[in-house]
Curated annotation (Swiss-Prot):
Protein name: Ankyrin repeat domain-containing protein 10
Stretches with biased composition (Polar residues): 303-325
ANK repeats, residue ranges: 20-49, 56-85, 90-119, 123-152
Disordered: region residues: 303-330
Organism annotation: Mus musculus
Keywords: ANK repeat, Repeat
Any one GO cellular component localisation term in the record: nucleoplasm
SUPFAM superfamilies: Ankyrin repeat
Length: 415
Protein backbone atom coordinates (compact mmCIF):
# COMPACT_ATOMS: atom_id res chain seq x y z
CA UNK A 1 0.00 0.00 0.00
CA UNK A 2 1.33 3.36 -1.06
CA UNK A 3 1.73 6.22 1.34
CA UNK A 4 -1.10 8.14 -0.32
CA UNK A 5 -3.44 5.19 -0.06
CA UNK A 6 -2.47 4.61 3.52
CA UNK A 7 -3.14 8.23 4.34
CA UNK A 8 -6.53 7.98 2.68
CA UNK A 9 -7.37 4.88 4.68
CA UNK A 10 -6.26 6.53 7.94
CA UNK A 11 -8.29 9.60 7.05
CA UNK A 12 -11.43 7.50 7.06
CA UNK A 13 -10.89 6.22 10.62
CA UNK A 14 -11.49 7.94 13.88
CA UNK A 15 -8.64 8.40 16.29
CA UNK A 16 -10.05 5.67 18.52
CA UNK A 17 -10.21 3.18 15.69
CA UNK A 18 -6.76 4.20 14.51
CA UNK A 19 -5.35 3.74 18.00
CA UNK A 20 -6.85 0.26 18.27
CA UNK A 21 -5.66 -0.79 14.81
CA UNK A 22 -2.15 0.66 14.76
CA UNK A 23 -1.24 0.87 18.45
CA UNK A 24 -2.96 -2.00 20.30
CA UNK A 25 -0.39 -1.98 23.12
CA UNK A 26 -0.94 1.73 23.67
CA UNK A 27 -4.72 1.24 23.69
CA UNK A 28 -4.51 -1.64 26.19
CA UNK A 29 -2.31 0.44 28.52
CA UNK A 30 -4.68 3.40 28.27
CA UNK A 31 -7.71 1.34 29.20
CA UNK A 32 -5.93 -0.91 31.67
CA UNK A 33 -6.89 -3.94 29.61
CA UNK A 34 -4.53 -6.38 31.27
CA UNK A 35 -5.96 -9.41 29.44
CA UNK A 36 -5.39 -7.88 26.01
CA UNK A 37 -1.94 -6.69 27.02
CA UNK A 38 -0.87 -10.09 28.29
CA UNK A 39 -2.09 -11.69 25.08
CA UNK A 40 -0.15 -9.21 22.93
CA UNK A 41 3.17 -9.17 24.77
CA UNK A 42 4.32 -12.71 23.88
CA UNK A 43 3.98 -11.95 20.18
CA UNK A 44 5.39 -8.42 20.24
CA UNK A 45 9.04 -7.85 19.34
CA UNK A 46 11.02 -6.06 22.02
CA UNK A 47 11.73 -3.14 19.72
CA UNK A 48 7.99 -2.45 19.44
CA UNK A 49 7.81 -1.87 23.19
CA UNK A 50 9.54 1.47 22.57
CA UNK A 51 7.33 2.46 19.62
CA UNK A 52 5.84 5.96 19.85
CA UNK A 53 2.26 6.69 18.81
CA UNK A 54 1.34 9.38 16.31
CA UNK A 55 -0.81 11.29 18.78
CA UNK A 56 1.42 12.19 21.73
CA UNK A 57 4.70 10.57 20.81
CA UNK A 58 4.46 8.23 23.81
CA UNK A 59 5.53 4.63 24.24
CA UNK A 60 3.21 2.06 25.91
CA UNK A 61 5.07 2.65 29.20
CA UNK A 62 4.26 6.37 29.02
CA UNK A 63 0.59 5.59 28.41
CA UNK A 64 0.41 3.26 31.40
CA UNK A 65 2.19 5.82 33.62
CA UNK A 66 -0.04 8.70 32.52
CA UNK A 67 -3.30 6.85 33.18
CA UNK A 68 -2.09 5.21 36.38
CA UNK A 69 -2.31 1.59 35.17
CA UNK A 70 0.18 0.04 37.53
CA UNK A 71 -0.45 -3.59 36.49
CA UNK A 72 0.13 -2.76 32.83
CA UNK A 73 3.26 -0.85 33.75
CA UNK A 74 4.63 -3.82 35.64
CA UNK A 75 3.91 -6.22 32.77
CA UNK A 76 5.63 -3.94 30.25
CA UNK A 77 8.77 -3.63 32.34
CA UNK A 78 8.87 -7.38 32.91
CA UNK A 79 8.61 -7.87 29.16
CA UNK A 80 11.70 -5.72 28.63
CA UNK A 81 10.46 -2.13 28.37
CA UNK A 82 12.91 0.51 29.63
CA UNK A 83 12.19 2.54 32.77
CA UNK A 84 14.10 5.60 31.61
CA UNK A 85 13.07 5.69 27.96
CA UNK A 86 12.70 9.30 26.79
CA UNK A 87 10.28 10.56 24.18
CA UNK A 88 11.76 11.93 21.00
CA UNK A 89 9.80 15.16 21.06
CA UNK A 90 10.01 16.31 24.69
CA UNK A 91 12.64 13.96 26.21
CA UNK A 92 10.23 12.95 28.95
CA UNK A 93 10.58 9.70 30.90
CA UNK A 94 7.74 7.62 32.41
CA UNK A 95 8.59 9.26 35.76
CA UNK A 96 7.83 12.68 34.24
CA UNK A 97 4.50 11.41 32.91
CA UNK A 98 3.47 9.66 36.15
CA UNK A 99 4.31 12.77 38.22
CA UNK A 100 2.40 15.07 35.87
CA UNK A 101 -0.54 12.66 35.81
CA UNK A 102 -0.65 12.64 39.62
CA UNK A 103 -0.27 8.89 40.10
CA UNK A 104 1.95 8.36 43.17
CA UNK A 105 1.54 4.56 43.13
CA UNK A 106 3.04 4.30 39.64
CA UNK A 107 5.72 6.83 40.51
CA UNK A 108 6.74 4.97 43.66
CA UNK A 109 6.96 1.70 41.76
CA UNK A 110 9.11 3.30 39.07
CA UNK A 111 11.41 4.74 41.72
CA UNK A 112 11.74 1.39 43.44
CA UNK A 113 12.46 -0.27 40.09
CA UNK A 114 15.36 2.15 39.50
CA UNK A 115 13.96 5.07 37.52
CA UNK A 116 15.99 8.27 37.34
CA UNK A 117 14.02 10.95 39.21
CA UNK A 118 16.42 13.84 38.56
CA UNK A 119 16.63 13.53 34.77
CA UNK A 120 15.57 16.76 33.01
CA UNK A 121 13.41 16.94 29.91
CA UNK A 122 13.77 19.36 26.99
CA UNK A 123 12.56 22.22 29.22
CA UNK A 124 15.05 21.37 31.97
CA UNK A 125 12.29 20.08 34.25
CA UNK A 126 12.63 16.99 36.43
CA UNK A 127 9.71 14.87 37.68
CA UNK A 128 9.34 17.09 40.75
CA UNK A 129 8.66 20.06 38.47
CA UNK A 130 5.91 18.05 36.78
CA UNK A 131 4.41 17.08 40.13
CA UNK A 132 4.41 20.76 41.11
CA UNK A 133 2.60 21.65 37.87
CA UNK A 134 -0.16 19.17 38.59
CA UNK A 135 -0.31 20.07 42.29
CA UNK A 136 0.17 16.47 43.41
CA UNK A 137 1.49 16.67 46.96
CA UNK A 138 1.62 12.86 47.14
CA UNK A 139 3.96 12.70 44.16
CA UNK A 140 6.09 15.52 45.56
CA UNK A 141 6.37 13.70 48.87
CA UNK A 142 7.33 10.44 47.15
CA UNK A 143 10.00 12.18 45.09
CA UNK A 144 11.46 14.10 48.01
CA UNK A 145 11.54 10.96 50.13
CA UNK A 146 13.52 9.24 47.38
CA UNK A 147 16.15 11.98 47.10
CA UNK A 148 14.77 14.31 44.45
CA UNK A 149 16.45 17.72 44.36
CA UNK A 150 14.02 20.53 45.18
CA UNK A 151 16.40 23.35 44.29
CA UNK A 152 16.85 22.48 40.61
CA UNK A 153 15.72 25.14 38.14
CA UNK A 154 14.22 24.63 34.71
CA UNK A 155 15.18 26.47 31.53
CA UNK A 156 13.14 29.46 32.71
CA UNK A 157 14.99 29.61 36.04
CA UNK A 158 12.05 28.32 38.09
CA UNK A 159 12.21 25.80 40.90
CA UNK A 160 9.42 23.39 41.73
CA UNK A 161 8.24 25.77 44.45
CA UNK A 162 8.06 28.62 41.94
CA UNK A 163 5.99 26.52 39.55
CA UNK A 164 3.60 25.42 42.28
CA UNK A 165 3.12 29.03 43.34
CA UNK A 166 2.52 30.10 39.75
CA UNK A 167 -0.10 27.39 39.33
CA UNK A 168 -1.81 28.41 42.57
CA UNK A 169 -1.05 25.28 44.62
CA UNK A 170 -0.34 26.93 47.97
CA UNK A 171 0.00 23.72 49.97
CA UNK A 172 2.63 22.37 47.58
CA UNK A 173 4.37 25.74 47.57
CA UNK A 174 4.63 25.92 51.36
CA UNK A 175 5.84 22.34 51.56
CA UNK A 176 8.57 22.85 48.98
CA UNK A 177 9.69 26.19 50.43
CA UNK A 178 9.93 24.72 53.92
CA UNK A 179 12.06 21.90 52.54
CA UNK A 180 14.40 24.32 50.79
CA UNK A 181 14.78 26.47 53.91
CA UNK A 182 15.40 23.44 56.10
CA UNK A 183 18.02 22.04 53.75
CA UNK A 184 19.79 25.39 53.49
CA UNK A 185 19.76 25.89 57.27
CA UNK A 186 21.15 22.41 57.90
CA UNK A 187 23.67 22.94 55.11
CA UNK A 188 25.07 26.07 56.75
CA UNK A 189 25.01 24.88 60.39
CA UNK A 190 26.80 21.64 59.61
CA UNK A 191 29.66 23.48 57.96
CA UNK A 192 29.25 21.77 54.61
CA UNK A 193 28.94 25.17 52.96
CA UNK A 194 32.70 25.64 53.39
CA UNK A 195 33.59 22.05 52.59
CA UNK A 196 33.57 20.79 56.16
CA UNK A 197 32.00 17.68 57.60
CA UNK A 198 28.66 17.54 59.27
CA UNK A 199 28.68 18.29 62.97
CA UNK A 200 27.57 15.49 65.25
CA UNK A 201 26.74 17.70 68.22
CA UNK A 202 24.67 20.90 68.11
CA UNK A 203 26.72 24.05 67.75
CA UNK A 204 25.84 25.34 71.24
CA UNK A 205 26.99 22.19 73.07
CA UNK A 206 30.56 21.79 74.30
CA UNK A 207 32.23 18.71 75.76
CA UNK A 208 33.91 20.62 78.57
CA UNK A 209 33.79 23.73 80.75
CA UNK A 210 36.27 25.67 78.67
CA UNK A 211 35.58 29.38 78.72
CA UNK A 212 37.11 29.87 75.26
CA UNK A 213 34.74 30.46 72.40
CA UNK A 214 35.17 28.76 69.06
CA UNK A 215 35.90 30.50 65.78
CA UNK A 216 32.20 30.30 64.85
CA UNK A 217 31.62 33.19 67.28
CA UNK A 218 33.65 35.52 65.06
CA UNK A 219 32.02 38.12 62.92
CA UNK A 220 32.69 38.34 59.20
CA UNK A 221 35.25 41.14 59.64
CA UNK A 222 37.38 39.14 62.05
CA UNK A 223 36.22 40.85 65.27
CA UNK A 224 35.27 38.41 67.96
CA UNK A 225 31.79 38.91 69.31
CA UNK A 226 31.24 39.88 72.91
CA UNK A 227 30.08 37.15 75.21
CA UNK A 228 26.42 37.93 75.80
CA UNK A 229 24.43 37.00 78.85
CA UNK A 230 21.97 34.19 78.20
CA UNK A 231 18.65 34.67 80.01
CA UNK A 232 18.11 31.68 82.28
CA UNK A 233 15.21 30.39 84.33
CA UNK A 234 15.39 29.48 88.00
CA UNK A 235 15.47 25.77 87.24
CA UNK A 236 17.57 25.97 84.09
CA UNK A 237 20.70 23.86 83.94
CA UNK A 238 24.06 25.67 83.59
CA UNK A 239 25.48 25.71 80.10
CA UNK A 240 28.20 23.24 79.29
CA UNK A 241 30.57 25.89 77.95
CA UNK A 242 31.03 27.58 81.33
CA UNK A 243 28.91 30.70 80.77
CA UNK A 244 27.27 30.17 84.17
CA UNK A 245 30.52 31.41 85.73
CA UNK A 246 29.93 34.87 84.27
CA UNK A 247 27.30 35.65 86.94
CA UNK A 248 29.83 35.29 89.74
CA UNK A 249 32.32 37.38 87.81
CA UNK A 250 29.81 40.18 87.24
CA UNK A 251 28.78 40.15 90.92
CA UNK A 252 32.44 40.52 91.89
CA UNK A 253 32.93 43.40 89.48
CA UNK A 254 29.81 45.17 90.75
CA UNK A 255 31.01 44.87 94.36
CA UNK A 256 34.38 46.39 93.55
CA UNK A 257 32.83 49.17 91.48
CA UNK A 258 30.61 50.05 94.44
CA UNK A 259 33.67 50.27 96.70
CA UNK A 260 35.42 52.57 94.26
CA UNK A 261 32.30 54.74 94.03
CA UNK A 262 32.21 55.13 97.84
CA UNK A 263 35.84 56.14 97.94
CA UNK A 264 35.35 58.63 95.12
CA UNK A 265 32.59 60.36 97.09
CA UNK A 266 34.79 60.62 100.22
CA UNK A 267 37.41 62.96 98.85
CA UNK A 268 38.77 64.16 95.55
CA UNK A 269 42.21 62.88 96.56
CA UNK A 270 40.83 59.33 96.73
CA UNK A 271 40.15 59.44 92.99
CA UNK A 272 43.89 59.48 92.46
CA UNK A 273 44.82 57.09 95.28
CA UNK A 274 42.22 54.53 94.33
CA UNK A 275 43.50 53.36 90.97
CA UNK A 276 42.55 49.69 90.77
CA UNK A 277 39.58 47.44 90.23
CA UNK A 278 38.97 43.75 89.81
CA UNK A 279 37.69 42.46 86.48
CA UNK A 280 36.86 38.74 86.12
CA UNK A 281 39.03 37.80 89.10
CA UNK A 282 42.13 39.66 87.88
CA UNK A 283 43.63 42.77 89.40
CA UNK A 284 43.26 45.46 86.75
CA UNK A 285 44.33 49.08 87.24
CA UNK A 286 42.18 51.33 85.06
CA UNK A 287 43.27 54.46 83.32
CA UNK A 288 42.41 57.98 84.41
CA UNK A 289 39.22 58.08 82.39
CA UNK A 290 37.97 54.92 84.05
CA UNK A 291 37.85 56.55 87.48
CA UNK A 292 35.11 58.87 86.28
CA UNK A 293 32.27 56.39 86.20
CA UNK A 294 34.31 53.24 85.46
CA UNK A 295 33.06 53.33 81.88
CA UNK A 296 35.74 54.42 79.44
CA UNK A 297 38.33 51.98 78.14
CA UNK A 298 39.69 54.10 75.33
CA UNK A 299 43.20 54.28 76.91
CA UNK A 300 45.36 51.15 77.20
CA UNK A 301 45.94 49.45 80.53
CA UNK A 302 49.16 47.57 81.17
CA UNK A 303 48.88 43.97 82.33
CA UNK A 304 51.66 41.75 83.59
CA UNK A 305 52.78 38.51 81.97
CA UNK A 306 50.91 36.46 84.55
CA UNK A 307 47.61 38.15 83.84
CA UNK A 308 47.78 40.40 86.98
CA UNK A 309 48.26 44.10 86.57
CA UNK A 310 51.47 45.50 88.06
CA UNK A 311 50.24 49.06 88.28
CA UNK A 312 48.51 51.88 86.51
CA UNK A 313 50.14 53.19 83.34
CA UNK A 314 50.40 56.94 83.44
CA UNK A 315 49.11 58.79 80.43
CA UNK A 316 50.52 62.05 79.16
CA UNK A 317 50.12 64.91 81.59
CA UNK A 318 49.35 62.73 84.62
CA UNK A 319 51.50 62.50 87.73
CA UNK A 320 51.54 59.77 90.36
CA UNK A 321 50.89 60.40 94.04
CA UNK A 322 52.84 58.61 96.75
CA UNK A 323 51.46 57.39 100.04
CA UNK A 324 52.52 60.56 101.91
CA UNK A 325 50.66 62.79 99.49
CA UNK A 326 53.64 64.17 97.55
CA UNK A 327 53.63 64.12 93.78
CA UNK A 328 56.30 62.21 91.91
CA UNK A 329 57.72 63.33 88.53
CA UNK A 330 55.61 62.67 85.50
CA UNK A 331 56.23 59.35 83.70
CA UNK A 332 55.20 58.52 80.16
CA UNK A 333 54.65 54.96 79.02
CA UNK A 334 55.43 54.15 75.38
CA UNK A 335 52.29 52.14 74.69
CA UNK A 336 50.49 52.11 71.38
CA UNK A 337 47.12 53.77 72.11
CA UNK A 338 45.42 51.56 69.51
CA UNK A 339 46.13 48.31 71.32
CA UNK A 340 42.92 46.82 72.60
CA UNK A 341 43.32 45.00 75.89
CA UNK A 342 45.71 42.09 75.26
CA UNK A 343 45.62 39.64 78.14
CA UNK A 344 49.38 39.02 77.99
CA UNK A 345 51.69 41.54 76.33
CA UNK A 346 54.89 39.49 76.55
CA UNK A 347 55.42 36.07 74.99
CA UNK A 348 51.75 35.30 74.30
CA UNK A 349 49.84 34.86 71.06
CA UNK A 350 48.14 38.18 71.76
CA UNK A 351 51.39 40.07 71.36
CA UNK A 352 51.79 38.72 67.83
CA UNK A 353 48.38 39.94 66.70
CA UNK A 354 47.99 43.29 64.99
CA UNK A 355 46.50 46.16 66.93
CA UNK A 356 42.84 46.93 66.77
CA UNK A 357 41.98 48.38 63.34
CA UNK A 358 40.69 51.91 63.14
CA UNK A 359 37.37 50.84 61.64
CA UNK A 360 36.40 48.94 64.78
CA UNK A 361 34.26 51.08 67.04
CA UNK A 362 34.61 51.55 70.79
CA UNK A 363 34.00 48.06 72.02
CA UNK A 364 35.46 48.60 75.44
CA UNK A 365 32.12 48.56 77.21
CA UNK A 366 31.20 45.14 75.92
CA UNK A 367 34.57 43.32 75.77
CA UNK A 368 36.97 42.51 78.59
CA UNK A 369 40.67 42.44 77.93
CA UNK A 370 41.82 39.52 75.79
CA UNK A 371 38.53 39.17 73.91
CA UNK A 372 39.43 41.11 70.77
CA UNK A 373 42.49 39.05 69.91
CA UNK A 374 40.47 35.85 70.06
CA UNK A 375 42.18 34.06 72.95
CA UNK A 376 39.39 34.46 75.52
CA UNK A 377 39.84 34.67 79.27
CA UNK A 378 42.97 32.53 79.38
CA UNK A 379 43.64 32.92 83.07
CA UNK A 380 40.02 32.16 83.90
CA UNK A 381 40.34 28.78 82.24
CA UNK A 382 42.55 27.65 85.18
CA UNK A 383 40.28 27.20 88.24
CA UNK A 384 43.14 27.17 90.79
CA UNK A 385 44.71 30.40 89.52
CA UNK A 386 41.32 32.10 89.31
CA UNK A 387 40.52 31.29 92.95
CA UNK A 388 43.90 32.50 94.22
CA UNK A 389 43.72 35.72 92.24
CA UNK A 390 40.18 36.39 93.39
CA UNK A 391 41.16 36.01 97.04
CA UNK A 392 44.32 38.08 96.58
CA UNK A 393 42.47 40.84 94.78
CA UNK A 394 39.84 41.06 97.53
CA UNK A 395 42.54 41.46 100.18
CA UNK A 396 44.41 44.06 98.15
CA UNK A 397 41.30 46.11 97.45
CA UNK A 398 40.46 46.16 101.14
CA UNK A 399 44.02 47.24 101.97
CA UNK A 400 43.91 49.99 99.37
CA UNK A 401 40.60 51.21 100.75
CA UNK A 402 41.99 51.44 104.31
CA UNK A 403 45.15 53.14 103.05
CA UNK A 404 43.14 55.60 100.99
CA UNK A 405 40.90 56.56 103.90
CA UNK A 406 43.92 56.99 106.16
CA UNK A 407 45.68 59.15 103.60
CA UNK A 408 42.61 61.30 103.14
CA UNK A 409 42.28 61.86 106.87
CA UNK A 410 45.96 62.80 107.13
CA UNK A 411 45.69 65.28 104.29
CA UNK A 412 42.46 66.72 105.70
CA UNK A 413 43.91 67.31 109.18
CA UNK A 414 47.21 68.54 107.80
CA UNK A 415 49.28 65.94 109.66
Amino acid sequence: MSAGAGAAVEAGFSSEELLSLRFPLHRACRDGDLVALCSLLPHTPRAHLAAEDSFYGWTPVHWAAHFGKLECLMQLVRAGASLNVSTTRYAQTPAHIAAFGGHPQCLVWLIQAGANINKPDCEGETPIHKAARSGSLECITALVGSGAHTDLRNASGLTAADIAQTQGFQECTQFLLSLQNHQMSRFCHNGTLSGGHESILPTHVSLGTNRKRCLEDSESLGVKKARTRVPSLDHAMPLANGEAEDDADRMHVDRECAAVSDMKNSSSVLNTLTNGSVVNGHLDFPCANQLNGMESRSHPCLTGSNGVSNGQPLSSGQASVSANGTEEPEKTMGINPEMCGSLHLNGSPSSCVASRPSWVGDIGESLHYGHYHGFGDTAESIPELSSVLEHTSCVRVEQRYDSAVLGAMQLHHGS
